């Protein structure tokens, strides 16, 4: 398979287009390979092909489908080196960092094999009711780079999938689906790359039963509106302005490196990365000083932290930092721009000290290497600050007192809480956001069932 030419995959076959677009390597700002731009006819053709493939695929047994996912995981890992290089090019990561995601993705392909779709029976003197879970039909997955987390459960439960990657990061998804044609029947999994009109075309299409989306809250709300006319089933994973609560009993020297790694990995472009640090007043100054020193050391190798993925987001973050500087915020480290000589879309990791909890730099989600530090005096205040705002994706708590940590976790209005460890989803555990950070869950058994519809059959005696 050639990793320098790219096609949409429709009906099991590569398809070009009269129009094309290209991504940009954020490490060097160089233009990458051309990618065909899907047309409205391509959308219709992909949906029709998926509908033709659906009867046979949905009737295959769960074990048959997950067996093919296992086979695909093996095939994918056999090309891991190529995918690491490709992911590094389109996301600006080091190959070592890209490898983390590539091997993570293989585990996501395998996780449905550890489950069975349940069949429930409810019986009384007059009847037996049998509850089963069936495929929804054709699913469109719209996401930037975590597509396997959507593909695996959708295929395992008997749906056909049309993947729509971000126009900024289309390459890995296109090659992933091209490789999948060696394993799955034609049209079971397809991929379309395109511009701003492609997502709405999929959401509004009457032949698609479900949308699974990862991205901004604003786009998620628009998907809900666009999908209303056809009563789409919709799962959303949207913005996360995630809090971390740091209690005074921690060992600062031992804890700061663990927190720092979660802050700056992939330049903070991780949906569950901490963005608001709530630090107990008793250790605030010593903690921030240690975090600043650790961060300064990390910025000596900016390529390991990585660039912002695209110029649009880069410019937004630059403006955010310019505004923060103009507002007089105390930037303990970092600042508006890294040295121009880096060439890529690099920003220095920025720690903003003693920010007002009500300020936009704290309340807004900044998808990049920006972290705010706020003091708190007791648990009630920490919970109040952490729960402020409309996001509720994830939170983390750092303490030696697990009883206190569990009590705090129960009061946080978020979908996932990580105690004394880095925010990192597990494919066996349901993942979803509270408030405006999402709708529904993915992963685990609940995630599998989110790609199903329920049927009850009554047998009268």
Curated annotation (Swiss-Prot):
Gene3D superfamilies: Aldehyde Dehydrogenase, Chain A, domain 1, Aldehyde Dehydrogenase, Chain A, domain 2
CDD domains xrefs: ALDH_AldA-AAD23400 (cd07106)
Keyword Oxidoreductase applies: yes
Active-site residues, Swiss-Prot/TrEMBL: 237, 271
UniProt KW keywords: NAD, Oxidoreductase
Pathway connected to this protein: Mycotoxin biosynthesis
Top-level division of the source organism's lineage: Eukaryota
Null allele phenotype: Abolishes the production of lucilactaene and NG-391, and leads to the accumulation of prelucilactaene G and prelucilactaene H.
Catalytic activity: an aldehyde + NAD(+) + H2O = a carboxylate + NADH + 2 H(+)
Enzyme Commission code: 1.2.1.3
UniProt family annotation: Belongs to the aldehyde dehydrogenase family.
EC top class, as a word: oxidoreductase
Name listed for the protein in its UniProt record: Aldehyde dehydrogenase LUC3
GO molecular function, one term: oxidoreductase activity, acting on the aldehyde or oxo group of donors, NAD or NADP as acceptor
Stored InterPro entries: Ald_DH/histidinol_DH, Ald_DH_C, Ald_DH_N, Aldehyde_DH_dom, LUC3-like
Role description: Aldehyde dehydrogenase; part of the gene cluster that mediates the biosynthesis of the mycotoxin lucilactaene and the lucilactaene-related compound NG-391 that act as cell cycle inhibitors with potent growth inhibitory activity against malarial parasites, moderate growth inhibitory activity against cancer cells, and no activity against bacteria and fungi.
Organism ancestry: Eukaryota, Fungi, Dikarya, Ascomycota, Pezizomycotina
Residues binding NAD(+): 215-220
Transmembrane helix is among the record's keywords: no
Coiled coil: none
């Amino acid at each position: 398979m050639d990793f320098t030419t790219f096609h949409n995959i429709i009906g099991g076959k590569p398809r070009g287009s009269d129009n094309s677009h290209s991504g940009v390597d954020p490490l060097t700002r160089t233009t990458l390979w051309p990618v065909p731009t899907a047309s409205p006819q391509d959308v219709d053709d992909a949906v029709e092909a998926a509908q033709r493939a659906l009867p046979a695929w949905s009737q295959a047994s769960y074990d048959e489908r997950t067996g093919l996912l296992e086979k695909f995981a093996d095939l994918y890992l056999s090309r891991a080196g190529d995918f690491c290089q490709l992911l590094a090019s389109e996301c600006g990561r080091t190959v070592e960092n890209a490898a983390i995601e590539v091997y993570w993705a293989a585990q996501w392909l395998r996780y449905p094999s550890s489950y069975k779709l349940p069949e429930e029976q409810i019986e009384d003197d007059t009847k037996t009711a049998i509850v089963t879970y069936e495929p929804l039909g054709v699913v469109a997955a719209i996401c930037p780079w975590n597509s396997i987390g959507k593909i695996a459960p959708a295929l395992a439960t008997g749906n056909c999938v049309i993947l729509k990657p971000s126009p900024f990061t289309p390459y890995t998804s296109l090659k992933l689906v091209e490789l999948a044609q060696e394993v799955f029947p034609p049209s079971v999994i397809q991929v379309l790359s395109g511009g701003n009109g492609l997502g709405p075309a999929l959401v509004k299409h009457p032949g698609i039963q479900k949308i699974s989306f990862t991205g901004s809250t604003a786009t998620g709300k628009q998907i809900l509106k666009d999908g209303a006319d056809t009563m789409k089933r919709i799962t959303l994973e949207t913005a996360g302005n995630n809090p971390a609560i740091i209690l005074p009993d921690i060992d600062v020297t031992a804890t700061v490196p663990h927190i720092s790694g979660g802050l700056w990995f992939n330049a903070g472009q991780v949906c569950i990365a901490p963005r608001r640090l709530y630090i107990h007043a008793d250790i605030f100054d010593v903690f921030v000083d240690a975090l600043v020193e650790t961060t300064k050391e990390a910025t000596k190798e900016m390529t390991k932290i990585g660039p912002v993925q695209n110029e649009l987001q880069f410019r937004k973050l630059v403006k955010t930092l310019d505004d923060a500087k103009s507002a007089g915020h105390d930037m303990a480290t970092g600042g508006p721009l890294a040295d121009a000589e880096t060439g890529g879309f690099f920003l220095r990791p920025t720690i903003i000290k003693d920010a007002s909890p009500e300020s936009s730099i704290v309340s807004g989600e900044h998808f990049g290497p920006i972290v705010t530090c706020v003091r708190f005096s007791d648990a009630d205040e920490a919970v109040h600050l952490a729960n402020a705002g409309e996001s509720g994706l994830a939170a983390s708590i750092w303490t030696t007192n697990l009883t206190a940590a569990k009590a705090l976790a129960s009061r946080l209005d978020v979908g996932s809480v990580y105690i004394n460890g880095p925010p990192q989803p597990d494919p066996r555990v349901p993942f979803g956001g509270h408030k405006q950070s999402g709708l529904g869950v993915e992963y685990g058994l609940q995630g599998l069932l989110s790609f199903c519809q329920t049927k009850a059959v009554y047998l009268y005696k």
